[in-house]
Amino acid sequence: ESAILSTKIIKLIGKTNPSGFAYELFLDEKGEKISKSKGNGITIDQWLEYASPESLSLYMYQNPKRAKKLYKQIVPKAVDEYLDCIEKAKSQKELQLLMNPVWHVHNSKVPKENMIMSFSMLLNLVETSNADSRELLWKFIKKYKSNISEKEHPIFDKLVGYAIKYFKDVIK
């Protein structure tokens, strides 16, 4: 209410209104405010068990003034959006690249790594293969693309671990 009243006073004296501070809310999948006591939603620490800090940064970067739904099932979509932004960055010219959120998330050092598959597809592979270890999942991945290695694809290698953990905790 203070901000509303201040805005009216500023307008009356003919001055420019200061920008108001937007308080960002985090919502669960039903659109209700996340609460520790209810245990709804996902914590930042939980997100970081299932996905990279960069995917969370991108998720937070988009629409900064809008309340965000923060629950476990949103993680795969957010990771896929992050991977898509990395892929798009490879072919973007300077001005387009500046508009790409991963340029900011990575402080202008966008990864050059080629993405092998989406996180959603990786989760499907975990489910259909019933892989419960990185080594086993990498064997299936190498059947899909034989000329790759964990060392050449460090981002994807981390995704492999995240996918197994996410599948065990959320999907299974």
What are these regions (language model features)?
Residues 15-16, 53:
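Short, well-ordered coil loops that connect the C-terminus of an alpha-helix to the N-terminus
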Residues 170-172:
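C-terminal low-complexity, glycine/proline- and small-hydrophobic-enriched intrinsically disordered tails
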Residues 3, 23-167:
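Catalytic adenosine-cofactor/nucleotide-binding cores of aminoacyl-tRNA synthetases and other
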Residues 1-7, 11-14:
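Divalent-metal (Mg2+/Mn2+/Ca2+)-assisted nucleotide/phosphate chemistry catalytic cores
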